[in-house]
Amino acid sequence: ESFAVARPEKIFAETSPDGRVRLSFQLHTELEDILDCRAALEIREKETGKPVFSAAYPVKLGPGETEYMFDARVDSPELWYPAGYGKQALYELRLQIFSGMREVASFRHRFAFRSFEIEEKRFTEKQGLFQFRVNGIPVFANGGNWVPPDMLPGTVGRERLRHLIALAAECGYNYLRVWGGGYYESDDFYDLCDESGIMVWQDFMFGGPEVPEFDPAFRAECRREAEEVVCRLRRHPCICVWCGSNETDEFYLVDRNCKRERPGGYYYGWTLLHRDFPEIVRRLVPDAVYIPSCPFMGTAAPAGTENNAHGFGTCHTQWLPQFSPDEAFDRTVIPTFMNEFYGMCPVPASSVKRFLLPEDLDCYCNPVFSAHNMLEVQRNDEWGQIFRHLCFHDPRRRFDVPLAELLRGFEICAEELMTRYLALLRRNRKYCGGAG
């Protein structure tokens, strides 16, 4: 991007799978008079550099900010598909604006052609379907949740992101949910997902708490942030779902321990997630899919169905109940879309040895290790369930088994449990649209 007279902003190429392109952008100038200019637009295939469209348009530059919109068409475009379903075809446009022979502004913009929708069905009163369709093809979303790779965003560069995305692709991922308790990732992350065919479910960064939307200044700030995020990220074909928050509806509309009795029966933050954000997404990305919060009951569930009912919409659950006997396990209601598949497992012993002395590796109950164990602080029983399974329901064994050996057992246990549950989901793809 460059400019001598006009600064380009809010660039977006809205596309249709039939090859239509509508390029919109703003130009900001310090001019005092109108300037007659010419815009030259060229579109090329990103991989080969082959030109597929070119045209010129008259442009008038004026003082301040001016919005522009150009229409173009690419004949028989290649479509973008998630990994395992087709090619990740990308295109790049270049726009140059000239006053006479002088270039006054230019920019490049990468985009793709694809369609996306969510298919929902109801098979029984307890079992439905929630499934992605990309370019009309049903897709099983196979992936996980993306949490910040580091507490300090500035330490995560493109090469580290490339390594992590490559690991995800190597594991067979075609889907990542950017969890709403983290932060918005850099453009590098989304560029790499575009190139790798990894679909992205993008949460807005609201991780569960109520927020003071009744304060006009705070609400306006949240709206501005959402607009900036959508404008920055909307060009990426990898982003298929925009979601207002992580678990906020679940906390304050369903959970009996957190349910709020506010005026109108809503929690503080409901207006942002259910009115403001969907309006912003529809306005800035007209064909985008928006969901107010996850878990999400969906539209196919019978009236009165609770949020996070595993047979409809999206759900969050842990894999620890998979300790149950086979006959009970196989009677489980099949989750239609497992969007948060959690279960606590410790880091490898090699990592623990970086912050513990050898004498503190004697057993799990060592006070130094306990000081680093947040689950103990929270009195969370998830590790306790693994202990009961791993130690054959004899809690005294946690004092006898060396810590490194116990941590290795935890890893094996977690791997077996997740494998068992993922196998259940994959062999029931008639009902399950994805696992993250």
Ranges and model annotations:
Residues 242, 279-282, 291, 298-301, ...:
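Substrate-binding clefts and catalytic carboxylate motifs of secreted carbohydrate-active enzymes
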Residues 202-209, 310-328:
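Acidic, His- and aromatic-enriched active-site or binding-groove loops in soluble protein domains
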